[in-house]
Amino acid sequence: MALTNKLHCSFNHQSIDEQYDIFQITTSDKYIARGARVLDTPIESIKAVSLVFDYGGSAFVAFYKKDYITQSALMKSLAEEKLSVKKIFSSEVKDYVLIRLFIYSLANYSSESNMFNNIGGKLYITHPSWKSRNGKNIKALEISVERDMCMTASATTFTSISVFKDKKSKALLELPRYLLSANGKFRRALNFDETKDAYVNKGIPGKKAELPFLELKQDTIRMGRAYFMNKIVEMLNDRFSAFLSVSFSNIDIERKVTERRDIDFVEKSLDCVSNHGVYLTSRMVDGAYSDDMQSLKSSLSKALGKQINDAAVDKSNDMEIVFLHNEDYYQDKDDPYKKLSRDHVAQCITLEDATGKIVANKKAVINTIFKEMTIKNDILRMYRITLDDWSSFKFEHDWIFGEEKSGKKYFMVIHPDGTFEFERQEGFLGRYRNKVLYELSNKLDELDLKGKVIILDDKGNINVISRTNLFCMPNPEIFKLEKLSRNEESREKYLSGIVDINLFNDNGECFYSAGIVGYGMNTAIPKAGLLYKVTVVEGKNVIESILETMSVMFVKYNSFTVLPYPIKYLIEYMKITDAN
């Protein structure tokens, strides 16, 4: 049994309607703009309890009965011709919006350490330790509940206007501006004169806001996203017990996979690359970052035990390592990545993402480079999976994995011995050599699911894997412990469903997740592992037969992979063919 982030809520609508007035604010335009003042006016000026906005034509606002405001008075205070206001009962509000109204009202109960800010129709939690030393950047946690009742907590950044070079850019001017009050809470800037010291909900390019899902250290365990999600549920039940009850939902675990199956992939990768000539080229401006490149070259040469060349010696067999900037750098420039030849193994290393990491964790970066080169070599030259023994599954016939990207369908057909071939269809009249792929292609068109992958097993069963908003939550008791442990017993009790690979059953529906590796795990879990849903299209559920294809680390170094590893091959094939 494990806890998930899906909320189970029950509402006392009669009590809610006796205590609160709820209004729906609607625009005659296509949508309410993200920076519209109407998203803050009810909170700032007319004492609304909370306001919820979900990117569309309507926002919802709640008031206490004692601060009664009429529909016409609310309309007058908003002072916008395109807006209309309608008073509604709580039973007319969708559950995910209603629970948000209560969650966002927690902005009225902030403490010294945690500030809850209901601004722009959203809820942001801030903490003194999340503010940069110079005060120009403030990390925050955006709390929301999706339409499927899954609670989410995502890191974001509020940045001082003074940081941005182009302060008059259209993108910046369209964002609402907020002032930081003396008590640490945000409030909407009322006029443009105030905005020189204001913040906007926008990060600095290349700097992603990060707050860990769960910290397993005594002094920081109450700083992760999971802690605040659990705290919100506790606060809701404590403060609003007359109006609702809320809890995280349970899900049954049917099977766990804890052992990895690719213990020798590092050696296999090294063996593959060392059997080829390797050359390092730069796509930088002439002479730029030459010291970084030479350092990279030296590290790679030492790991391989052979010289790294400056150019190809045998073009038909050599492997290329390309040194360049990352994608963000080339946003407004000519990107050399898009011009790389894909008729040979070419692995890119970026200055921003890799060179610094080589100093910090040389082994991990170099092993990642070599395993990526090996996968590309499997695709371009070997036509066989070499980093795992596919034949050990003892399948009798072919397995097929398919995915769609930008209207194009791609398929990987794997034979029982681990050899494979790819096919793709472009356009409505595109043809396949393998006739089975026509049916799979049609199935992909029919299913409206997120991030879907289609699978045909060796018995003719067809399944689809799709991404959900679900993830597992830690046992709330973990936040009360005086001493933390990461041993097997503690992982089972407090981190059920979060660590290792788990197969779930939820009232007949099948899900799985590939969590963090439990054995030897670190003290922090950066991200929550999403649950993937397995939908049977024809025949039986097949995911258990290939659950171990997620227990490999050659897809994402030192981590289990969230999709069967043939999808990694398929994605690399897509990149190669799209570039060509």
Where do the language-model regions lie?
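Long, contiguous domain-sized segments
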Residues: 1-239, 243-252, 257-261, 280-580
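Membrane-penetrating hydrophobic segments
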Residues: 263-272, 310-311
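Non-transmembrane, membrane-adjacent beta-strand/coil modules in membrane-associated proteins
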Residues: 275-278
